[in-house]
Amino acid sequence: MAAFLSVLFVFANLLFPLQKASAEVMDHTKYQMDWSYSKSKKKPIRTELIKTADGKIAFCLNVDLKSPSGQDLPEMGKVDINVYRVLLNGYPQKSPQELGVSDWREAHYATQLAVWNALKQIDINDLDFRNKNVEKVTKDIVAKANASEELQEITMSVVPSEEQQAVLKNDFFETGLYTVETNAKSGTYKVQATGAPEGAKFANEKGEAKTEFNVGEKFRILIPKQTPAGGFSFKVSGNLTKLQGIAHKGTPTIQNAVVLLERSEEKTSPELAVSWKKANGHDNKPNKPYTPNEPHKPNQIKR
């Protein structure tokens, strides 16, 4: 019976393999610094360079615990928004030169101090800085992070959102341009119509008809001019990607860590509407403009 159950267990695992939670193997490299001293903790504040197996830089989330040394740390979800804003304004998202220093270690150390400050594990105003470059960069990162309104969550909206009336231009009724507003850094979106007439299409700013658009592209709707008056609805569905601060769980002795990773999400807009009317009530030719200063003149006979 036990042998039968063992075979059954192996067979079940082949059919339904267990899903392993996302994780990152992290290790650290020491570098020498004696750049700040905590007056409240009565000790220097030190850090190390933490990297994932594929070379991404991670930051410590527990000032008093040890750095990872080859452990496989599972994901915990998105990090605190204040830490996220620090990461966007610190190293390595900004180069040492952009941060105002020439040494990557100063840029890295300043970013780590700003992370701990955001978590309220240290207070940069409590530190006795022994390196003026580090002091300036740390305070600059904290100030920019505090002023930031950047969100981790991916947002998407379509403008305009009100019903649009397409107007006749040459062979098509055309809407104005729609803009897909998003904080995603990359991705694509599709426009999905419900009840659209034959020949209706979506085109970018260059007039190219497309079924899929890149983030940053605008689109308009084109309806053939012979189409009877009417309307239809549509929605925009996007597959969008941006950096998010993903926290990874340590152990009672190994610190939690955070690394910026690209994450993708599906987003769908509410239903939008477009309509059009037949020109002149009978055909789709535009009305000739009325010119009151040029009245019709009957033929006149010269005397």
Residue ranges of model-derived segments:
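Short, solvent-exposed loop/linker segments at the N-terminal edge
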Residues: 162-174, 300-303
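Low-complexity "stalk/linker" and mucin-like segments enriched in Ser/Thr/Pro/Ala/Gly
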Residues: 185, 192-216
